[in-house]
Amino acid sequence: MSKSIVLLPGDHVGTEVVAEAVKVLKAIERTTPGTSFSFSTHLIGGAAIDATGVPLPDEALEAAKASDAVLLGAVGGPKWGTGDVRPEQGLLKIRKELGLYANLRPCSFASSKLVDLSPLKREIVEGTDFVVVRELVGGIYFGERKEDDGSGVASDTETYSVPEVERITRMAAFLALQHNPPQTVWSLDKANVLASSRLWRKTVTRVMTEEFPTVPFQHQLIDSAAMILVQKPTKLNGVVLTSNMFGDIISDEASVIPGSLGLLPSASLASLPDTNTAFGLYEPCHGSAPDLPAGKVNPLACILSAAMMLRLSLDNAAAADRIEQAVREVIDSGVATADLGGSSSTGEVGDAIVKALEK
C-alpha cells in the first residue's frame, strides 16, 4: 500500500532540499520491492503568502491532515518582513493544528570524517550521540502574557500540567527503549527555582519509576546541562528531555556541535512511534538561507529528515538505515557541499546518495 507524503517546500533553499529528499525517496521506492510513495506538493510560508495571502492555505492543512507524514523544507525570508502576516505563522499553525507535541532533534556525526568540523576539539565531541526531545505545545511560549502597557512592566507565564509532562516523558522513555540496553533519559529543568520545573521533575520521576523501570534516568539543572554540552557532550548521550523554552535553547546550542546546520534533521510527532506509524512533520534544522545562491545548500539535513520519517512514521526502518548508510558513504567519499569543505552542488550530493542506494 502506498504511503502518502505531503511536501511543503516553503521558501528559498527549502524547495531545493525537498527536491533532493524526494529524489532519494524515489530511489528507495525503485530499489525496495513493495515500497510505494505518493507525493502531494503544497504551499507554506512566504510562497503561500505571495500566492494566496495567507502563510498556510486551508488546502495545504487539509492535505497534511489526510497524509501519513509531512516533509517540510524551510520558511521565511526578508522579503516578507515582520508584518502582521509572516511566513513563520504557517509553521506555528500547522504544528498546532496537527497536534505535534514532541520535537526530536538528534545530535550526532553522520560520519566520523566530520568530527574535525566541530568548533569543539575532537577529543571533546567524538562519540557524541543524543537526541533532544522537546515539549512543543506548552510552557512559557503558550502561557499567559502581558505586554508593557506603559507601566514599564511585562510578563510571560510558564505553565505545565501533569498530563503534558507525562506525555512528553513517555516519548523520551519510548525512544530510550529502542536501544539495548535502554539509553539514559536526561531530564533538564530548573527545579531549584521554578515551581513549573518542580512539577516537571516530580512527574518525570513518577512516570519513569512506575512505567519504565528498566530505563535509567537522571535529572539535570538546565544551566549545568548547558555547561556539560560544551565541556563533554558525550556525558548527555541518550535522550535529553526538556520543556519548550529550555529545549529551544539547548537544541540550538547542541546544533553547532556537528559543525553544520546542513547536517541536522528533526521530527515533530503527534503520538508515540510505538507502531512506527506516528504522524509527524519532518524538516531540516536550518532556515531558508535567502542569501545562498542556487545549488549551494547542503541537502543532507532534509535527506536525513526523510530517513527519520521512514523510521518513525512510515514503518520502514530498513530504508532509513540504508539512507543513513548512503549518506555516510557519500561524505566519506569526499562528495560534499561547501559548508563541509567540499565543492559539490546540492544536486550532485543528492545524485551521489541515489547512486549509493542503487549500487
Swiss-Prot record:
Does Metal-binding count among this protein's keywords? yes
Q: Where does Mg(2+) bind?
A: 223, 248, 252
Give the UniProt record's GO annotations in the biological process aspect. L-leucine biosynthetic process
> What does the entry comment about cofactor binding?
Binds 1 Mg(2+) or Mn(2+) ion per subunit.
Q: Which cofactor does it need?
A: Mg(2+); Mn(2+)
Catalysed reaction per UniProt?
A: (2R,3S)-3-isopropylmalate + NAD(+) = 4-methyl-2-oxopentanoate + CO2 + NADH
Positions that bind substrate: 95, 105, 134, 223
What are the EC numbers?
1.1.1.85
InterPro entries named in the record: IsoCit/isopropylmalate_DH_CS (IPR019818), IsoPropMal-DH-like_dom (IPR024084), Isopropylmalate_DH (IPR004429)
Q: Which UniProt keywords apply?
A: Amino-acid biosynthesis, Branched-chain amino acid biosynthesis, Cytoplasm, Leucine biosynthesis, Magnesium, Manganese, Metal-binding, NAD, Oxidoreductase
Supply the enzyme class, top level. Answer: oxidoreductase
* Cellular component GO terms held in the UniProt record: cytosol
Question: What does the record give as its pathway?
Answer: Amino-acid biosynthesis; L-leucine biosynthesis; L-leucine from 3-methyl-2-oxobutanoate: step 3/4
Task: Kindly report the protein's main subcellular placement as a broad class.
Answer: cytoplasm
Its localization reads: Cytoplasm
Residue numbers marked as site, Important for catalysis? 141, 190
Q: Which GO terms describe its molecular function?
A: 3-isopropylmalate dehydrogenase activity; magnesium ion binding; NAD binding
Residue sites binding NAD(+) per the record:
77-88, 287-298
State whether keyword Cell membrane applies: no
| Gene3D superfamilies, alphabetized | Isopropylmalate Dehydrogenase
Q: Looking at the record's lineage, which domain of life comes first? A: Eukaryota
Per UniProt, subunit arrangement is: Homodimer.
What functional role does this protein have? Catalyzes the oxidation of 3-carboxy-2-hydroxy-4-methylpentanoate (3-isopropylmalate) to 3-carboxy-4-methyl-2-oxopentanoate. The product decarboxylates to 4-methyl-2 oxopentanoate.
Family affiliation: Belongs to the isocitrate and isopropylmalate dehydrogenases family.
What is this protein's name? Answer: 3-isopropylmalate dehydrogenase
- Which organism is the protein's source? Diutina rugosa (Yeast)
The lineage is:
Eukaryota, Fungi, Dikarya, Ascomycota, Saccharomycotina
